[in-house]
């Protein structure tokens, strides 16, 4: 499943982000805490060069907290300060400015020594579509400035946003992978709703989700669908879920499209509890 999804505004965004780097002090790299590697754009390292950076593990409330802790340690071992946040309810957002000041202390001390008038920290927010950039900006700015939505690709224009007197943010359109050569990356992004359902095979996503749950959270899978045991054959598992959820066609046959929708919706709406689809040790 090689998915290619690179609208023109994303290619343009890459060029504009590269140009804007000379205007900013620090980069906030926003990733989905459930899939920190799959929700990182592989071009980001190349684009950002040596800019100071803070990794923001967003949607931390939807992820397995013990795995998020391991990811935090993983990135910090690589020298990237990392915060677990929730841009919807504000969890962890009060740590962003202090962490930025700490990281930029030497730069701002040098500016002060040269007699440069103090100014706000200028930050660039980067991330793939639907990772929560607009929600984060609105929460920090305490007003509805950036368009938000659960559709990938909502933000399409870059804009500066003032956050008090000490921080200015530059939002960018989500820059997604030009293509997903690793099938797992595409499946993980699809399972969390980061890419449009119209460009993927949803049954593949449902199969991935069930196998993932069977391997990592089997008791949650059994509890959700009232299963005594998890059938080995994926078709049999679909049949069981279809029956339990009443996804039937005339004549009592299983409606696999409906069953697929139920499984994906249950994953995305946290009916299995907080899930982490990636662990540092598996990368």
Swiss-Prot record:
SUPFAM superfamilies with a match to the protein in the record: P-loop containing nucleoside triphosphate hydrolases
The UniProt keywords, alphabetically, are: Cytoplasm, GTP-binding, Hydrolase, Nucleotide-binding, Ribosome biogenesis, RNA-binding
- Predominantly, its location class is cytoplasm
Location in the cell reads:
Cytoplasm
Residue ranges of domain CP-type G in the record = 14-178
Q: Which family does it belong to?
A: Belongs to the TRAFAC class YlqF/YawG GTPase family. MTG1 subfamily.
Q: Which NCBIfam families match?
A: GTPase_YlqF
According to UniProt, the name of this protein is Ribosome biogenesis GTPase A
Q: Origin organism of this chain?
A: Bacillus licheniformis (strain ATCC 14580 / DSM 13 / JCM 2505 / CCUG 7422 / NBRC 12200 / NCIMB 9375 / NCTC 10341 / NRRL NRS-1264 / Gibson 46)
This chain is encoded by the gene named: rbgA
């Amino acid at each position: 499943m090689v998915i290619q999804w690179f609208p023109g505004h994303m290619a343009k965004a890459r060029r504009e982000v590269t140009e804007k780097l000379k205007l900013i002090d620090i980069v906030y790299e926003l990733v989905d805490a459930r899939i920190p590697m799959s929700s990182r754009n592989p071009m980001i390292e190349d684009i950002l060069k040596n800019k100071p950076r803070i990794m923001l593990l967003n949607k931390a409330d939807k992820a397995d907290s013990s795995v998020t802790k391991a990811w935090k340690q993983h990135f910090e071992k690589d020298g990237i300060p990392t915060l677990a946040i929730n841009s919807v309810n504000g969890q962890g957002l009060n740590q962003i400015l202090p962490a930025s000041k700490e990281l930029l202390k030497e730069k701002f001390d040098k500016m002060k020594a040269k007699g440069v008038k103090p100014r706000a920290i200028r930050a660039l927010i980067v991330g793939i579509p639907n990772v929560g950039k607009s929600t984060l900006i609105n929460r920090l700015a305490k007003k509805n400035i950036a368009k938000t939505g659960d559709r990938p690709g909502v933000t399409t224009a870059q804009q500066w946003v003032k956050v008090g007197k000490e921080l200015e943010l530059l939002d960018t359109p989500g820059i997604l992978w030009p293509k997903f050569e690793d099938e797992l990356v595409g499946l993980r992004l699809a399972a969390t709703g980061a890419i449009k359902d119209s460009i993927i095979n949803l049954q593949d996503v449902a199969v991935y989700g069930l196998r993932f749950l069977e391997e990592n959270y089997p008791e949650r899978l059994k509890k959700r669908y009232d299963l005594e045991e998890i059938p080995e054959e994926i078709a049999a598992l679909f049949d069981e879920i279809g029956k339990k959820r009443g996804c039937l066609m005339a004549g009592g046959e299983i409606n696999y499209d409906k069953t697929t929708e139920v499984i994906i919706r249950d994953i995305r709406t946290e009916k299995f509890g907080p899930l982490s689809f990636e662990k540092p040790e598996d990368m």
